[in-house]
Amino acid sequence: MNRLKEIFQKEITPALVSKF
């Protein structure tokens, strides 16, 4: 579960941030 959180913060968060 921790790895999923890591991937989320590393991959998905930057993708969301670059959208805005």
UniProtKB/Swiss-Prot annotation:
UniProt KW keywords: Ribonucleoprotein, Ribosomal protein, RNA-binding, rRNA-binding, tRNA-binding
Q: Which GO molecular-function terms appear in the entry?
A: rRNA binding; tRNA binding
* Cellular component terms per the entry's GO annotation: ribonucleoprotein complex; ribosome
Does the keyword tRNA-binding belong to this entry? yes
What quaternary arrangement does the UniProt entry report? Part of the 50S ribosomal subunit; part of the 5S rRNA/L5/L18/L25 subcomplex. Contacts the 5S rRNA and the P site tRNA. Forms a bridge to the 30S subunit in the 70S ribosome.
Instruction: Name the family the entry cites.
Output: Belongs to the universal ribosomal protein uL5 family.
Described function: This is one of the proteins that bind and probably mediate the attachment of the 5S RNA into the large ribosomal subunit, where it forms part of the central protuberance. In the 70S ribosome it contacts protein S13 of the 30S subunit (bridge B1b), connecting the two subunits; this bridge is implicated in subunit movement. Contacts the P site tRNA; the 5S rRNA and some of its associated proteins might help stabilize positioning of ribosome-bound tRNAs.
Other comments on record: Under acid-stress, this protein is expressed at a higher level in wild-type B.cereus than in the acid-sensitive mutant strain NB1.
Q: What is this protein called?
A: Large ribosomal subunit protein uL5
State the gene name recorded for this protein: rplE
